[in-house]
């Protein structure tokens, strides 16, 4: 019986010839990423709960401060200092203020065929480069950090066969929100979501990252794509060569298969308070907003900023809307400066912030108050996610978010 991409990566990491869904294997973890959201807890466990604390391979560790940058309180500063001091003591690769963790990982570390643990749920983004990325909690992270290994229950795989091309003004963000709405927030619980088909050739790396990144919002254990020339070009442009590129075998077993015509996708919003609560953006048009956010690990790349800046050129942000623009990394920020995008945003009245998680994380920049409404390219719209528990978050593409910031109400680009 053939194997899926997920099964092949696990088999490689486990040092066995074959695995199948439902098996449990001990695996060698190729890389371990953690951010300032929870790393302080890992450090406390390392220092206080281990008889013989040590790190199996410090070269596998990447620590990134991105959730509260710069620190917003003495408590946050102390937590980040703990992280910084530990990294200095042990020689851990450390990034602060350089961008959102998943963007940095994609730019600098992720390679096809790797099995990567991240102390963040959106680690599944790494599947855009054919890596098995999955989020773990502090205990599992610490075990892998100390032993270099962990256990994995081999997931079933849902396959999405993409055909056609997205219409003009429709984006990968609209596609993945459509899929999540179709299968539901629990539709891929502990399963791998695999994307293949001729339609993949029309999707850029930025598109692919956006798709894989949000798969956890359908409950997915991971998301995976085959490594093609587009992925290889991205990898090599960032100074890396592939280690192992996998495709599913013709006789691999899938728990479900969906055929999706990209040409049928329309602009989408996810309404409060669930990511699968989706509707065509036009149905939510006219909903007044107080804030708009263009950024995050899902939609803060240069391609997203280009979309937003193109719509803002010659226009102004609505006077009663706070429009936050947050590049996903310093590399993205610098490119946006070179292309004049930052100037366009500032002339239009947007607030351009340093690269970080910003309001998507909802604990520092741009949090919204009681009764306020945010439209966001962030990852989640749960109650209280972006501030007050009694606020409202709509999720949408960079184009819809920018158009809404201009109009002062939810709108699509063709409504400008």
Description of each model-found segment:
Residues 1-416:
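Fe-S-dependent hydro-lyases/dehydratases of central metabolism
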């Amino acid at each position: 019986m053939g194997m899926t991409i997920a099964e092949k990566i696990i088999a490689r990491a486990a040092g066995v010839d074959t695995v199948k869904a439902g098996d449990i294997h001990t695996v060698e973890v190729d890389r371990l990423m953690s951010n300032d959201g929870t790393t302080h807890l890992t450090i406390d466990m390392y220092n206080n709960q281990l008889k013989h604390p040590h790190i199996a391979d410090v070269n596998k560790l990447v620590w990134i401060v991105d959730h509260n940058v710069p620190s917003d309180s003495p408590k946050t500063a102390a937590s980040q200092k703990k992280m910084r001091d530990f990294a200095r003591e042990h020689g851990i690769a450390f990034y602060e203020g350089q961008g959102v963790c998943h963007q940095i990982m994609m730019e600098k570390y992720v390679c096809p065929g790797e099995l990567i643990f991240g102390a963040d749920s959106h680690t599944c983004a790494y599947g855009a480069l054919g890596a098995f990325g999955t989020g773990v909690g502090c205990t599992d992270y610490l075990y892998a950090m100390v032993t270099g290994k962990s256990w994995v229950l081999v997931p079933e795989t849902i396959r999405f066969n993409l055909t056609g091309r997205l219409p003009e003004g429709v984006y990968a963000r609209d596609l993945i929100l459509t899929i999540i709405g179709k299968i539901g927030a629990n539709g891929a619980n502990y399963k791998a979501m695999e994307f293949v088909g001729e339609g993949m050739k029309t999707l850029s790396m930025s598109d692919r990252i956006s798709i894989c990144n949000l798969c956890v919002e359908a409950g997915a254990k991971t998301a995976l794509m085959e490594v093609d020339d587009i992925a290889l070009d991205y990898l090599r442009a960032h100074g890396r060569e592939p280690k192992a590129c996998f495709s599913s075998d013709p006789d691999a077993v899938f728990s479900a298969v969906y055929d999706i015509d990209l040409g049928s996708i329309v602009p989408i919003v996810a309404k409060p308070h669930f990511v699968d609560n989706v509707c065509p953006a036009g149905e939510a048009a006219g909903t007044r907003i107080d804030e708009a956010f263009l950024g995050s690990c899902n939609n803060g790349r240069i391609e997203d900023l280009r979309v937003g800046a193109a719509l803002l050129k010659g226009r102004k942000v609505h006077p009663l809307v706070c429009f936050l623009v947050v590049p996903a990394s310093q590399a993205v920020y610098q490119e946006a400066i070179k292309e004049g995008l930052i100037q366009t945003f500032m002339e239009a009245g947007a607030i351009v912030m340093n690269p970080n998680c910003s309001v998507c994380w909802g604990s520092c920049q741009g949090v919204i108050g009681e009764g306020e409404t945010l439209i966001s390219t962030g990852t989640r719209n749960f109650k209280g996610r972006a501030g007050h528990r009694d606020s409202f978050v709509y999720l949408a593409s960079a184009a819809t978010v920018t158009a809404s910031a201009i109009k002062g109400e939810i709108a699509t680009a063709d409504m400008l």
